[in-house]
Amino acid sequence: MHQLNVRSRSWDPTVVSQHEVLRLTECEKVRDQVFSLREYWKSRSPNVGFFTLGAASYLDAVERRDAYFESAREINPILRANFDWLCERVRKGFEDLLGKPVSFGDRYALPGFHIFEYFGTDISDDKPSTRAHFDMQWAHAMPGRRPEKTLSFTLPIEEPTGGSALEIWPVHCDAVRPDFDALKYAATNPSQTLRYVLGQMVVQDGLLLHAIGRSSIATPKGYRITFQGHGAKDSEGWKLYW
């Protein structure tokens, strides 16, 4: 695997950029608040410790868009009450970065948290290529129209031993044929590795082939917590959601 070069303090949809958003003490504050809200975590896999805090369109809007909106109505007030300052910092940061108005969609889920728990077991056979995807969740959350532009962001809050990463393959959704097999491509082509840094938000347009990466050790232990979401641009500006 190759280390991925990133560009900081600017954003170009053709590259991945990294931006400092939180100090380490603020990451700890967010982490502790996420732990205090464990009753609101939603288990996403019966076999591994994978949870979300927040409604995620790529999971909740796939079969029933109305169920996604209902989940958003239920959990958004909890997120606002506990992380309003974080949401606003990210929103204002994107306004500075993009030079356009940025807001949260009224009906859509606020950005939320991915939570993975690792128990120190050997996961050396884990293959990020089996998770390779393009961020096409807007097709479920906003059916019938494609946004003018898109973005996806991930803000690392907590890492297990061995850290965490993003895997990216140098292929863009708009450059492939309709019958492109993302999983087959990822399994047969090398990826580039971007190691996450706590408090530094990673931004891309979501349309580069990518996947949740691995820890740098075979037996990670602890939590991988990220604050994340997406953006969609229309004539009025950018809307952030998850």
What is each PLM-predicted segment?
Residues P111, E148-L151, Q200, I225:
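Residue-level detector of short, conserved catalytic/binding motifs and their immediate flanks
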Residues M1-R9, G120-R131, P190-G213:
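Generic detector of solvent-exposed, compositionally biased contiguous segments
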Residues Q33-V34, F153-P156, I225-K233:
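Short, Φ-rich (hydrophobic/aromatic) sequence segments
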Residues L22, H114-F119, F134-M136, L155-E159, ...:
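Short, flexible loop/turn elements at secondary-structure junctions
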Residues M1-I75, A81-E88, K92:
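N-terminal auxiliary "cap/dimerization" subdomain that precedes the catalytic jelly-roll/cupin core
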Residues V176-W242:
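Catalytic core of Fe(II)/2-oxoglutarate
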Residues V62-D125, A139-R145:
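Signature of the catalytic double-stranded beta-helix
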Residues T121-R195:
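Catalytic core of non-heme Fe(II) oxygenases with the double-stranded beta-helix
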